[in-house]
Design a protein with these regions (language model features):
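Outer-membrane beta-barrel translocator/pore domains, especially the C-terminal barrels
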Residues: 1-311, 315-394
Length: 394
């Protein structure tokens, strides 16, 4: 339960929204660990101030476009509460992006509420058609300034180690002060370790019981200089030029002068039945991938679909998808083959597994077989399912 008192003051060119709330959570655990409470509770207040301005000006040779400049700031305060006795069912720490930048709780899920004393600032500019409202450009840059070091953590990476999975962490940004260690769930502030965060030696990548593996918790005395801010996050979206669009997400650490994350995707989407995607993803110490996909008619009744994901870091194919679709006046049939990399204990790979999905759909009746449309909509950005009569399926 989270009752909240909010005041929304909006007008032409500005908004001002302060909020005060109170989180109250109680668990009713049927199989609690001996010695642990079966009905643990947590209660804590929080405050938030969200404010911004919107400036507009005419753009284009005839003033047919409008450009905006939109500064925004969100101050969040959540006091620290020890939540170690609370279970974790569905809580995780998401990647830092512009959506997460302005959230009060840095965790997804209610099992952990992160303490916060921070100010998120962002600046957005948009360019759109004055008459139709069609957007041509959107660009945003933002950063979080921390006034205190976050203390609430989650043990997800320790659980991965105990399960024999690889360490899901980043190398330390200061290897001279912390030689040979890997810090888990590093994100706030920046990629700098902070007290209460778990760490592991490199041998732990072979398993928690491997010789030389040491797992511990960072104490305040082990931390030197703290980063006062997060990475700088930026997003650029270009649309409206001859069915082409470009999306760029970039995350930069100003203290190490390194790129922590980068995503680029180009899409060609001339109509609802044709789409081609070209993408590149990079995340420091985690992944470096190419991702291409398409859906395209190859005849009056035939359509083809495909996707290929290749890891530059591992020099191997992560996923392959190939399929076809045949449509007539009375029925539609789809066959999709998927090959994907299977990982085993310890992070090793066991080659590519193969699965095949078959779906038959009759006009006016339900489909038979696995829902290939749902799968393709998740795998191919811009893919649109169509029935045998060539009508779009919502």
């Amino acid at each position: 339960m989270s009752p909240e008192l909010r005041w929304s003051n909006r007008g032409p060119g500005y908004f001002f929204e302060p909020a005060l709330g109170y989180h109250v959570t109680q668990y009713d655990l049927k199989n609690a660990v001996m010695g642990e409470p079966s009905t643990p509770t947590r209660s804590l207040p929080y405050g938030r101030l969200d404010a911004g301005l919107v400036f507009e000006r005419a753009a284009g040779s005839a003033g047919q476009r409008t450009q905006t400049l939109e500064p925004r700031m969100v101050y969040s305060y959540v006091p620290y509460r020890n939540q170690d006795e609370l279970p974790i069912f569905d809580t995780a720490l998401p990647d830092l992006n512009l959506t997460e930048l302005f959230r009060t709780n840095r965790y997804v899920g209610d099992d952990r509420i992160g303490d916060a004393n921070q100010l998120a600032v962002g600046l957005t500019t948009r360019l759109f058609d004055h008459v139709s409202g069609a957007q041509y450009l959107s660009a945003t840059i933002g950063q979080i300034r921390y006034f205190s070091i976050p203390r609430v953590t989650i043990p997800e990476d320790i659980l991965r180690l105990e399960s024999g999975l690889p360490v899901a962490g980043l190398p330390l940004v200061n290897p001279l002060a912390w030689p040979g260690l890997f810090v888990t769930n590093a994100r706030a502030p920046g990629s700098q370790p902070f007290p209460g965060q778990t760490y592991a030696t490199p041998n732990c990548q072979l398993g928690a019981n491997a010789p030389g593996c040491q797992i511990g918790v960072i104490t305040p005395g082990q931390i030197g200089v703290q980063y006062p801010a997060s990475d700088i996050v930026s997003e650029i979206s270009l649309t409206g030029y001859k069915h082409l669009s470009l999306d760029l997400n970039y995350q930069w650490n100003p203290y190490t002068s390194h790129t922590d994350k980068e995503e680029i995707e180009v899409q060609y989407h001339p109509d609802s039945s044709r789409v081609v995607n070209l993408g590149y993803r990079f995340q420091e110490g985690i992944l470096k991938q190419y991702d291409t996909s398409f859906a395209w008619p190859i005849g009056g009744h035939w359509n083809a679909v495909g996707r290929w994901v290749y890891s530059l870091a591992d020099r191997t194919t992560i996923e392959q998808i190939a399929g076809f679709e045949y449509k007539s006046c009375c029925y539609r049939i789809q066959v999709v083959q998927r090959r994907y990399l299977r990982r085993i204990s310890g992070g090793a790979t066991a080659g590519l597994d193969t699965s095949i999905a078959l779906q038959l759909e009759l006009t006016g009746l339900s489909s038979v077989g696995k829902p290939a449309d749902t799968f393709l909509q998740k795998e191919i950005r811009g893919y649109t399912a169509r029935d045998p009569a060539n009508r779009e399926i919502p």
